[in-house]
């Protein structure tokens, strides 16, 4: 079958002469992959048969099971993850060439996992938009394409299944986690040959035989080669039509933007990081942004690139990270414009970082920075810090430093950070964390979590530069920094028009600022409200109670009498909430409850429960709700009686006094399911689902003894008894110790039977039951009071984390949507906030007014 380089118009060089000079692919040093001697002859012959411009970018990964059988007639699978394009894609071209020369089917496969670090709505939406473009482009080329989105019911190992019927796997060579570990896992799972192809760099990483630590040294070594490569057009392949594979383990699905919001909601990812409206994914969006920059920005790039308050940079890094545009094409275009400084950044600084990561195993560790930098930072590790900030404070832009907080706001709301500002942003971490290691972890976390170009070698280049990488010592030593180059925020702020920068970065995430009402200030409602507020939207909370928190409540009678009569403690198992928990602990909002927890059997036998980390808020459980409500507008003691939809697709709230509030673009209800229906004066999509769940009641008793009641334990689950739970409240961190305070919770069935009785009488009855179960010995209390929780225990919880009607703009959340615990409430609120933020990103669901002036590029 004939395969050749397509002929080019007269006067244009294909660059084959240049590529031929570089084909000594197997003589290059390998940090990973199989040695030449262990590869079978067919593997060497396969790469040797490739055109030189492709062969130089290839390297093999050999399985521990052996080099595999390249001669079998299985399909060629191209797994695309960091080259989401068909134009000038060396990895795709390699796969197409191999399939055509061997006359076997070719499949382009793209998967999107829930399990990569920092997986969020933001990254998922960007990648889904990229997948839609890639699917269209593959169809235009007549290539078979399959997409797999990991989510409940769709968590099979599709790629592993496809590899069983393949002869070779071709994939993008990307030098960082999680791709590196995924490829390694595939290498160990199968004997299938894996061919890695560099599609990210103009100068292939395989051509750089070591990690360079200074940009000038890298430039001196490779600039002449870059000068030869830059103007060369990418050779096009003249190949026969691709053969489509049959009997694949995955059906073809349409990657349709109308499905994205629902797909994303189903994924177990971080829904607190919303999509970025002004930066859509895909080759089409990349092309549009690049062409706009060529028309109106590149000529002024050198003069304006360092001013973070003006539109002076290309903002192409997210598209380069995921390979939605070819760096070869960008280099040619920039060279044609004579944009030397842009080429310096695109080629020298960016590809220096790629080569560094290619040759460095642990880029998340201080071992990645130069020895002099490690030494000086460790020497100054104990220097006094002005203040130590928890992750939550920094993530929300709450350092108190105006410039730094604006930088973080840009990351949080818009998924990007101006490169020059990133340098100052990163160095500030050293003075707000307890060690250089913690500063590095904080930089990596915040950058990768929020930035669309996070987890990229260029990102690591910028982050590690803040700690001395690619730099030299600066004398004299400074506190905390030592001889690492200083970059004070106050000095940088004097060079910036802060008012202009603030107007730009504080615009909301979305086409306009939405007004959102949250009815019910329980944990789910508070978490949703805070996420939406952090993304720049106007949120108002309404609650019939005196304060926030819902059932995460504390009754304070007097200084010595305090009872957590609602939620007793909480656990956090979900990885999406771990960072919040760690921050709350560091800030003193929560602390571990080290009390001994047991189970009391029907015969009175006491057995210890399985060990687990239980947490309580400090100095009382209600403090967690107050913490989440900080900075939010809360209308306490304002019960809402009606939610009324208007003709303009907005809604009004009417409270118990008849006062009207609104209009609101969205109304989120954090209420018991049976209370929601009567509020809604028009139907909505999910109203019928509320009949599938209910909140059962719970009667609580608050009891105090003058002296400690010694039981040998601090909390107990009581089996098959009217009292299902009892706890020594005084054993929790930060509680008053003058009196011995206890809380008893009744069984749901007993609570139903006695719900309308006097709560204080019920409390005394529960105390008698408890005394009977213990066989007597409970002392005479000095205080007994009851409380009726009419809505407490979900039975059952819905099999979804939130409810959302995009046509109405109405949503509902609560622990009854998830696990029935505090953790479930937090996840439910996060999920509903994600639905709203994705809705703002999806113009097909509701009409969106024209963008505000603040959304226009800065002039």
Where are these regions (language model features)?
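Conserved flavin/dinucleotide-binding core of flavoenzymes
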Residues: 470-477, 492-495, 547, 555, ...
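A conserved short coil-to-beta-strand element within the FAD-binding core of flavoproteins
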Residues: 636-650
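Glycine-rich FAD pyrophosphate-binding loop
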Residues: 533-556
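Beta-rich, aromatic/charged-enriched effector core domains that present basic-aromatic interfaces
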Residues: 33-37, 144, 149-271, 275, ...
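Active-site-proximal binding-pocket segments
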Residues: 307-496
